[in-house]
């Protein structure tokens, strides 16, 4: 597979993962209010509400766990970028309530579906 094909394949996997994550969260009582918010210093995959909280969701999609779980790919740099993006989102949206974070880790299955894991408040 060439470099361009590999990038297209990764983008398609990521897009499918974000849709699957949104569906997964809806089934668990989250209201998805935004997706793909790009800030100056980071990106938010999904913005949800649950109860009175705004939940900033990082979606990590992988084809296997050979190099660790998807959630393990969220390191310090990504955490800082998420926090910066959340601050910017808060200002632009005028959000005054609490903000929490979550990670949805997805691993693709041979049938085209995903195994999903939700980690709520992963940075505490």
Regions found by a protein language model. Name each.
Residues 1-35:
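Acidic-basic catalytic patches of nuclease active cores, encompassing PD-(D/E)XK
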Residues 8-16, 41, 65, 69-80, ...:
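Residues at secondary-structure transition points
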Residues 18, 43-45, 58, 78, ...:
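Acidic active-site catalytic centers that drive phospho-/nucleotidyl reactions
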Residues 25, 44-70, 74, 82:
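Conserved catalytic cores of phosphodiester-cleaving nucleases, focusing on short active-site segments
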Residues 30, 35-38, 61-62, 68-81, ...:
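Amphipathic, hydrophobic secondary-structure cores in small proteins
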Residues 35-38, 43-44, 104-107:
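Short, solvent-exposed loop/turn elements at beta->coil junctions and helix N-caps
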Residues 92-124:
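Domain-level recognition of nuclease-like catalytic cores that cleave nucleotide substrates
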């Amino acid at each position: 597979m060439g470099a361009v094909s590999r990038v297209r394949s990764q983008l398609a996997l990521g897009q499918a993962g974000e849709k699957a994550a949104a569906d997964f969260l809806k089934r668990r009582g989250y209201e998805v209010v935004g997706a793909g918010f790009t800030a100056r210093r980071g990106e938010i995959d999904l913005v949800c509400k649950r109860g009175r909280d705004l939940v900033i969701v990082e979606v990590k999609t992988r084809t296997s766990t050979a190099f660790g779980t998807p959630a393990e790919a969220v390191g310090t740099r990504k955490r800082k970028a998420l926090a910066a993006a959340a601050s910017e989102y808060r200002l632009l949206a005028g959000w005054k309530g609490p903000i929490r974070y979550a990670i949805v880790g997805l691993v693709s299955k041979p049938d085209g579906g995903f195994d999903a894991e939700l980690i709520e408040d992963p940075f505490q």
